[in-house]
Amino acid sequence: MKTLLTIFVLALGAVSAWANNGVVGFWTTIDDETKEAKSVVQIYEYKGKIYGRVVDVLKNKNATAKLPGSPKIIGLDIIWNLEKDGDEYNDGEILDPQKGKVYGCSIWREGENLIVRGKIAFFGRNQTWLPNKTFKGDGKPPIPNIPKH
């Protein structure tokens, strides 16, 4: 009985460690210039691919994207079609809503943080997104709605 309990506790710890290394969840983005928290993005899985949707903008809740129709940034998918590749998710795209430009995208975990890389060919840059443990969604993963760009 003691051995069975030990195996159960070890297995539970392994599953918990694996779950904490995932990318799915809520993440706080940081403004490159001011270094202040900017928005909350929900990273979610849909049909085996990873997507990211802005669920909150921390300063200007009515901010719009530089896209046809000027959609609000809140509710906008900014990451789409990422595929798992080892410990990373690659071959997707990311939208910069303020510029209306789309770049290649990869994401991966470094410790508790999420590293988001936007790139054109071999050139790119990384952003570090912080885990957001206070934002509560409705519990249902969204259905992707990739913006026209």
Predicted stretch roles:
Residues 1-5:
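Positively charged n-region of N-terminal signal peptides that target proteins for export
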Residues 6-7, 17:
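Cleavable N-terminal signal peptides
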Residues 13-20:
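Sec/Tat signal peptide C-region and signal peptidase I cleavage site
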Residues 21-38, 127-134:
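K/E-rich alpha-helical interaction surfaces of small helical-bundle regulatory domains
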Residues 28-103:
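Central antiparallel beta-sheet cores of small beta-barrel/beta-sandwich binding domains
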Residues 45, 58, 108-111, 130-135:
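A short, sequence-level motif marking secondary-structure junctions
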Residues 90-93, 99-119, 124-128:
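Surface-exposed interaction patches
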Residues 120-149:
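Edge beta-strand at a domain terminus
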